[in-house]
Design a protein with these regions (language model features):
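Sequence/structural signature of small/polar-enriched beta-strand/turn repeats
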Residues: 64, 116-119, 124, 252, ...
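Acidic Gly/Asp/Thr-rich repetitive segments characteristic of extracellular carbohydrate-active
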Residues: 2-29
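Beta-strand-rich solenoid/repeat architectures in extracellular/passenger domains
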Residues: 53-59, 73-84, 100-111, 123-155, ...
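Extracellular beta-strand-rich solenoid/capping regions of secreted or surface-exposed proteins
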Residues: 20, 35-49, 55-97, 107-118, ...
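Mature, well-folded catalytic/scaffold domains that follow N-terminal targeting or propeptide regions
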Residues: 251, 276, 301, 326, ...
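Short beta->alpha connector loops
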Residues: 13-14, 32-35, 54
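Structural signal for repeat-unit boundaries in curved repeat scaffolds
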Residues: 69, 92, 97, 116-119, ...
Length: 414
């Protein structure tokens, strides 16, 4: 950014007056906590930064709108949980580069390319959404028989024209807490099918805790802790744990493309039909170095339903619940390795599969028709502990299947 004029403010009237007067690009330095703040718009080229412990507490559902080439840093921003604490102006074609650094919000962060907004770059480093509610945010991308809830953090290109491009570099994003998950999705990055594109160099997350608030048994709606839809990301890295708490709440979900996706902390779901990692997209290498564990009827561990993944590596996969399949693959893939076993603890039950409720046994390792792999290697055993549930089902094909540590079906009649 260009050199900015400095201006320090410590009251609502000083802040609103300065923004209304405009003038040359200015870095507004905020001191203290300002309450009952009306809606604010940051002029092009301006920055808003906080001195230690600075905060903006907005009135009602008001928030901060960014225009072009803005930077917001070292601030806490509070609004209604279902409102946008930070949003982008959709009345201009290009937002330039928007920078969000070291921020905490109550309320959503929603950078949405719609209206006139067609291009720009978003850079985020250290953003924590403490509380937000995206359950009613619209529109929602749809496919595979379901629609996807937006997230506490949302980057979404809604343009119909594929020439529209939003680029991004997103690091140190986090949302919610174990005792206070955000509602709706967690981290949501999306383009539009056949239309506006999102291309991100990095999507790095810390701890994410989300609860979609979807009624159990719903067949046409899902959410995710980290969800990439019709967008391309060179590197996804989940440095912190990702935990979902509700029905149909996928922990990690991909409908787009990623060169490399790495998860280095536990992936956990605690609701029915909530999958640990599900892919309908394309990944070069998927590496999960911490446990995947699900607790809920139909909460499968890992699925490939469309697209392909070349290299797949998991630490371990454990499920607890009827119909909670451990690994289920129905498309071509390269090599799958699980280093410390696949274990299921459940029988036959109902689960959501591509927009329909189906009955499935909690098989530990299932290669469906359409699965065609180079190799499957599992150390630490494959076990299904449910009554009448087989440990392994191979209806597809794999050139090399190697399981060490035993294959065990614990229930009678398995």
């Amino acid at each position: 950014m260009a050199t900015l004029t400095d201006a320090r403010v410590s009251s609502v009237s000083e802040l609103t007056g300065l923004l209304e007067r405009g003038g040359p690009p200015t870095e507004v330095q905020l001191a203290g906590t300002l309450e009952a703040v009306p809606a604010l718009t940051l002029p092009p080229g301006w920055a808003l930064t906080g001195l230690p412990e600075a905060a903006l507490v907005f009135a009602g559902g008001a928030g901060l709108t960014l225009t072009a080439d803005n930077r917001v840093a070292r601030l806490r921003l509070e609004t209604a949980p279902d409102a946008a604490a930070i949003a982008a102006d959709t009345g201009r074609a290009d937002c330039g580069t928007l920078e969000l650094d070291d921020l905490t919000t109550v309320g959503r962060v929603a950078i949405v390319a719609e209206g006139a907004l067609r291009s720009g770059h978003l850079r985020v480093n250290a953003l924590h959404v403490e509380a937000a509610d995206a359950r009613e945010s619209a529109p929602r991308p749809a496919g595979y028989g379901v629609e996807v809830l937006q997230g506490a953090f949302t980057l979404y290109n809604l343009q119909d024209d594929p020439a529209s491009l939003i680029t991004a570099d997103l690091t140190r994003l986090s949302a919610g807490a174990p005792d206070a998950p955000v509602r709706g999705g967690g981290i949501f990055v999306s383009g539009t099918d056949g239309g506006g594109r999102v291309e991100a160099a990095r999507l790095h997350t810390g701890a994410v805790h989300s609860d979609g608030g979807i009624a159990p048994g719903t067949a046409d709606r899902i959410s995710g802790g980290v969800f990439v839809v019709r967008a391309s990301v060179r590197e996804v890295f989940n440095a912190g744990p990702v935990t979902t708490y509700g029905a149909n709440d996928m922990v990690l979900d991909l409908w787009g493309a990623a060169d490399v996706w790495t998860a280095a902390a536990p992936l956990t779901s605690r609701g029915p039909s909530a999958i640990g990692f599900v892919s309908f997209g394309t990944i070069g290498r998927l590496r999960v170095t911490a446990p995947v564990e699900t607790f809920g009827t139909g909460a499968r561990g890992f699925n490939i339903y469309d697209g392909t993944i070349d290299i797949i590596e998991f630490d371990r996969i454990t499920t607890h619940g009827d119909a909670a399949v451990g690994v289920q693959i129905g498309r071509p893939f390269g090599a799958l390795t699980v280093f410390n076993g696949v274990h299921t603890h459940g029988g036959t039950g109902e689960t959501l599969v591509k927009g329909a409720i189906e009955r499935l046994p909690a098989i530990a390792l299932s290669l469906l028709p359409g699965a065609d792999g180079g190799s499957v290697r599992v150390n630490g055993g494959v076990a299904a502990h449910g009554e009448g549930v087989p440990a392994v089902q191979v209806s597809g094909s794999v050139k090399d299947l190697d399981i060490t540590g035993g294959v065990r079906a614990g229930g009678a009649g398995s």
